[in-house]
Amino acid sequence: KGIITMGSPLEKAACIRYQELLSPNIFNGYGTTESFWNTFLRPYDLPEMAGSAGRSCTDDEVRLVNVYDDRKAEPDDTVPCDNKTEGEIIIKCPNKTTYCYVNNEKATKDKFYKGWMYTGDIGTWNSEQFFTIAGRKDDMIISKGENIYPARIEEILNSHPKVQECIVTGVPDSTRGECVAAYVIKADESPVSYTHLRAH
């Protein structure tokens, strides 16, 4: 018996709880609508690598390439495997992807290049090629020239014991361009302040 989870990263505390209560055999996957799942955390990766999206599936190639404003990175224009430098996740999986959108040439051109699908997801990878999702290119907040990905902040806030769930977005700001706004659902009725959450 085992559990497969998808849709968002499996945070370490949740992983340990699920392993204790339900099953030690947990698989957490990352993928897209166009290409099914493409990376997996396997049971032997957990709980140490919880929070990451795992490594590529057997029949898939997954890379992290540089992001440019005016063009797509070439498939071999990868970022360092240092778990810090962010890039766009690209995927090659011929057995699962059609590499086109029917009757939509523009979307096909935007998404596919030289046999690779450019997901629009931003992440990092380490020397063992474990991927960690940082957010979406489209969701990026630019505040005084700094690129901020909401998913990073959401992960930190969601780890606070007084936070049940949160969502982070950018709001217009006259001096910064955008500021970060977090909408938080408290875990209980006890008070929690902005200062307290910021210190976390």
Predicted regions and their residues:
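Active-site glycine-centered loops adjacent to acidic/histidine catalytic or metal-binding residues
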Residues: G7, G31, G54, D121, ...
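Conserved ATP/PPi-binding loop(s) of AMP-dependent carboxylate-activating enzymes
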Residues: R55-D59, D70-D110, I148
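Residue-level recognition of short loop/turn positions
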Residues: E61, Y68-D69, S127-E128
